[in-house]
Structures are given as structure tokens and as C-alpha cells.
Amino acid sequence: MSSFQFEQIGVIRSPYKEKFAVPRQPGLVKSANGELHLIAPYNQADAVRGLEAFSHLWILFVFHQTMEGGWRPTVRPPRLGGNARMGVFATRSTFRPNPIGMSLVELKEVVCHKDSVILKLGSLDLVDGTPVVDIKPYLPFAESLPDASASYAQSAPAAEMAVSFTAEVEKQLLTLEKRYPQLTLFIREVLAQDPRPAYRKGEETGKTY
């Protein structure tokens, strides 16, 4: 059996500081903005020359927060309520033999300075500090397949949770938005996805998250 070693090329800077509440797929929270910081020796402007002409990117990354748990031959996909089991290769589960993930994100801007290359991203679904091992431009002609079938995940999950704020919180958000634009929208979109475990959906647990 062959083994391979890969170098980290960058790190994600994201509003998600922990796994809880991170969208289960990219694009579900469109106001989730973040950055990919390339690290030496890959933080060269030449390495991203022409990338600004693409609207979206594939990011290949490492599931660094779950890799110690090892892989599992079957998992419980959230889309099936967290109860039915599927083979790990029929899911996007983090518990894989090789803990590699892929995320399709919006490329908003490429910023190059003397010693840094930063990609500004939108529709992000990655936790802060995620190690990145590769990036590739998204090619619509080859990768957009409208006739494809996707079993239990044919369409995006509905954002069903109603989200409201008290008057006091709304006042605080107005102040915070001066520093964090779109913060209110971001919170609404995250909570509307109901980030609780799939088997808790629809329950009134009374818990505070």
C-alpha cells in the first residue's frame, strides 16, 4: 500500500471559531465571509496569477478537528435525520480514511502584498484555522451537471428555523455592525439552518446554545 505526504499551503480565517454551527455544506450561509492566507513558500503573487478571473474555487482541506477519531465504515448523515446509516464513501462525513474535505466557495478578491497572499472568500463553511492543502478554480462547463442525481441530498436543506432578536440585542447588533458588516444577516442565516444535531431538529429542548 502506498502512502503520500502533502504540504499545507494555507490556513482559513473564518467567523466560525468551533465546529458547532458551521454549515454542513458551502453556500448555505451566503453571508459567511472569510479569508484563505497562503503560507511560505506558496505566498507568492505568481502562484495566484490569473485566479482573480474566476468567481468560485474548490478548496481542499484537512478535517483537523476530527482526524484523531479515525475513520468509520458507516456514518449517520444529518440529511437522513442522524439515524439511518450509510457507507462513509456515500457521504461527506468527516470520519474518512484520509481526512480530506472539499469546499466550493466564492472568490471575492485576491489581495497580494510583498510577503502575503490573501484570498477573500464568501459562502464559507470552514472552521477558523482549517489547514488547506490545495485550491483549484471551479469550471462551470465541466462541474455543473444539472441532470445529476444525488440520492438523499438532491436539493439544499430548507432553512426552517424562525429567528428573532430582542430589542436589546438588535441595539447591540447595530453597534457591532459598524465593525462587522452584515453581522445580523450572518447570525440569521446560521441559526435558520438549525445547527443542532440532526436528531434534535424540531425538538423544544429549552437549551441555550
Predicted region positions:
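Conserved positions in beta-strands of structured domains
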Residues: 13, 105-108
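Short, surface-exposed coil-to-beta transition loops
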Residues: 101-103
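Mixed-charge, low-complexity intrinsically disordered regions
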Residues: 1-99, 112-116, 124-209
